Amino acid sequence: MLVLAGPGSGKTLVITERTKYLIEECGIDPAQILVITFTKAAATEMKRRFQRKMNRLCPVTFGTFHAVYFAILKHAYNYSADNIAREEQRYQCMREIIAKEHLTYEDETEFITSLLGEISLVKNSGIEIANYYSKNCAETVFRKVYRQYHEFLYKNRLIDFDDMLVYTKELFEQRADILAAWQNKYRYILIDEFQDINRIQYDIIKMLAGKRKNLFIVGDDDQSIYRFRGAKPEIMLHFKDDYPEAETVLLDVNYRSVKNIVTSAGYLIGHNKERFQKKIEAAG
């Protein structure tokens, strides 16, 4: 099911109520339900609201994409928190690479941050490094930087947050038995803020959903904010190309904003033609 949830329409409530419905009305084992969102704070708050609503502990998994995928890698490769590259390790690695390649810059921290951002974008987009053109340095130089950064992580048995996605996808592609085990564990998948999903996150979700296709996604294509990290709201726009039988529901009442704000926002966003056409009304 695809739920188009406008601003202030109760996205979190929809997710928690749907989860409650699966357990109480459909008899689904709570341990087979996976709820994913984009920030740790959001996942924690959603879990708190759900547990309060249930008035008892339920073993539903609430987490971010990275937390869920890292848990999968922990089982497969015996990773621990020590295997996650710390920021200071990543920055020191980049300083050494920059010095080795004799790269020039105005501000070291900004330059390193920008390079790491580009490396992250390449990983999250799933594009070949040979097809990426850097904004910070010549293409051949960037490829050297990218390769040396990867080698540093590999030699030290470290992964960064983007590797959590890349390695999980590779694991599922290479080990059908492991994929089947996780498909059996998480038979029902609910995703909040789906408009901010990126290509590799979505590829993994499709593999997890498998033939059961028990996906319940909630989002608003008008509110995508993570394009700089590879988010692709067009994935949501074309969701029904992958799941043509999915039902679409529109939550069209904004309970947060007054009428003139809702009307003005609707007029502005209406100029964007690459979106779901929808009209949002104010509650009052």
Sequence positions of predicted segments:
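Conserved AAA+ ATPase "sensor/coupling" helix adjacent to the nucleotide-binding pocket
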Residues: 50, 96-100, 264-272
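ATP-hydrolysis module of ASCE/P-loop NTPase motor domains
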Residues: 57-59, 77-163, 186, 254
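Conserved coupling/interface region of RecA-like P-loop/ASCE motor cores
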Residues: 78, 223-281
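Conserved helicase NTPase motor core
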Residues: 1-4, 34, 42, 61, ...
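Residue-level signature of catalytic and energy-coupling elements of molecular machines
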Residues: 8, 39, 64, 94, ...
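Proline-centered turn/helix-capping motifs that create local helix->coil transitions or kinks
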Residues: 107, 124-127, 212-213, 268-278
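P-loop NTPase Walker
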Residues: 1-80, 180, 234, 263-266
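Amphipathic alpha-helical transducer elements in NTP-driven molecular machines
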Residues: 40-43, 62, 66, 87-91, ...
